[in-house]
Amino acid sequence: MSNTIAYFDITIANEPAGRLTFELFDDVVPKTANNFKHLCIGDKTNEAGVKLAYAGSSFHRCIKGFMLQGGDFTRGDGTGGESIYGEKFEDENFELKHDKPMLLSMANAGPGTNGSQFFITTVPTPHLDGKHVVFGRVIYNRSLVRRIENIPTTSDRPDQEVTISSAGVLSPDEFAQLEAERQAKQAGSDGGDIWEDWPQDEEGVDAEKPEEALVVAGKLKEVGTKEFKAGNFAVALDKYQKALRYLDVHPVLPNDSPAELVESFRSLRLPLLTNAALCALKLPASPNTSSLVVSLTSRALTLPNLSASEKGKALYRRAQAYVLKKDDEAAEKDLKGALECVPGDAGVIKLLKDVEAKRKARREKERQAFAKMFG
């Protein structure tokens, strides 16, 4: 790649969060890209001899569904910053448009007021065209952008400090090595996951094509199953849910889709839902995990052409979640339904007996309480 590749190493609440890697559009806006490049390297000073660098500065303004803003390394609140050309420099051109998420663009206070502040778009922002100079894009770890975007804020400032702990530029050899490592993962040599967490952020796959979404989801399922077998239930849950997001780009396939493709989607979506539910059940009990299990298994139960054993498994796992939620009535109903699907299943029978015993004990306790009140 002939354009500059720059990076930020990010910490969130003083904990390492990963690296954002950028392509700078030297070929379209060389002056603007050069400013960002040298602020990443930190090899320039101003007239007073003060170092100009992003390292140590923070993202001071984050608006979900819009953008993340940073680069004010002098004041940290959006009122400061300085370019390598002086305090401000002119708008180079507006050739590139804000037509997608994950673009780097210059923040400003009006025409010709570019300094060091920048923003990363998280959605298309066409209303900024002709006002802000687009000069790059996030190419790797867009999931980290989404993580930052979803941090709660107070007056648009993240409640957890998001800091650029270090920044720099990759040499051509370093970038080639990074690309080789990603290709090795894609080839499955280490069972890795190279895809962005959200399909709309993944440029290496056209998730709008059902066949491509299916391939990614299938590979993610393999990664999730590997993590599950290793006892890494939280990681496995994350992979299964990520796989579902890729499938869910196509919640319903077109009517003219081949029957084999429709069945492939169904037969992959079902185990992803039930496996994710099982992972959540193996995590420490909480209202969030039990609600997640109910949601996942309820989705599974809406899928067409379920076999008796598939329906029984989903009902059983939903019943387990209802038990955690202390909704024994709903649990008993699901367990009885599961028993109709899988007669004689030892796990279902045992849990049903436990739930019935609990409900009986509760009714007896209530009866005794009423007897004391009115006896």
UniProtKB/Swiss-Prot annotation:
What is the E.C. number?
5.2.1.8
**PROSITE patterns this protein is in?**
CSA_PPIASE_2
Q: What residue stretches are annotated with the PPIase cyclophilin-type domain?
A: 7-169
Gene name of this polypeptide? CPR6
Q: What InterPro entries does the entry give? A: Cyclophilin-like_dom_sf, Cyclophilin-type_PPIase_dom, TPR-like_helical_dom_sf
Q: Where in the cell is it found?
A: Cytoplasm
Functionally, this protein is described as follows:
PPIases accelerate the folding of proteins. It catalyzes the cis-trans isomerization of proline imidic peptide bonds in oligopeptides.
The record's Gene Ontology biological-process terms are:
protein folding
Q: Which family does it belong to?
A: Belongs to the cyclophilin-type PPIase family. PPIase D subfamily.
One GO term in the molecular function aspect is: cyclosporin A binding
Each TPR repeat occupies one of these ranges, namely 217-250, 270-307, 312-345
UniProt catalytic activity: [protein]-peptidylproline (omega=180) = [protein]-peptidylproline (omega=0)
Q: Which organism is it from?
A: Cryptococcus neoformans var. neoformans serotype D (strain B-3501A)
CDD domains linked: cyclophilin_ABH_like (cd01926)
Any idea what this protein is called? Answer: Peptidyl-prolyl cis-trans isomerase D
